[in-house]
UniProtKB/Swiss-Prot annotation:
It is found in: Secreted. This is APK peptide. It comes from the Eukaryota. Its main location: secreted. Expressed in the CNS but not in midgut, ring gland, thoracic perisympathetic organs (tPSO) and abdominal perisympathetic organs (aPSO) (at protein level). The lineage of its organism: Eukaryota, Metazoa, Ecdysozoa, Arthropoda, Hexapoda. One of its GO terms (cellular component) is extracellular region. Keywords: Neuropeptide, Secreted. GO terms for biological process: neuropeptide signaling pathway.
Length: 16
């Protein structure tokens, strides 16, 4: 789903 992809993207781009 779009929401799932958005959440994945935010986590992937989260500051390390």
């Amino acid at each position: 789903s779009v929401a799932a992809l958005a959440a994945q993207g935010l986590l992937y781009n989260a500051p390390k």
